[in-house]
Amino acid sequence: MNIMICDDQKDELENMKQIVLEYAAVHSELFLEVKCFSNPFDMLEEIGKSGAPDIALLDICMPGVLGTEIAREIKSKSEDSTDIIFLTTSSDFAVEAFALHANDYLKKPYTKERLLDTLD
């Protein structure tokens, strides 16, 4: 199972990565591969090379592009098979997130437990 994380804030990205790696260690039967990106365009380039992830954790507000736009691209490349989880400081994007068939969204700051529950 492939998980891609994209957040332009490196401290947030590192925090999510550590939580997801902890989840991967507990669920070794899933054979999780985690890839992290601070640039959403790098993430899209990787998806073009290796295919869409099973799960994408996307910050909504990033320089130059919204996470919702990235989600649209991922959904079009994965035929809607990618689970999308948005991360945002504002709940204003919740309606748009669910219109894109997001699986969930986490309001920052989120707890480790909330992210782990979402991954389950």
How should these model regions be labeled?
Residues 1-4:
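Non-catalytic signal-transmission and effector/linker regions of two-component phosphorelay proteins
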Residues 6-7, 37, 56:
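Conserved sequence signature across two-component system core domains
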Residues 7-9, 89:
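Acidic di-acidic motifs
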Residues 8, 40, 60:
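Residues immediately flanking
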Residues 10-35:
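Two-component/phosphorelay signaling modules centered on CheY-like receiver
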Residues 34-42:
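Conserved Asp/Asn-Gly motif in the active-site loop of CheY-like receiver
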Residues 44-45, 50-120:
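CheY-like receiver
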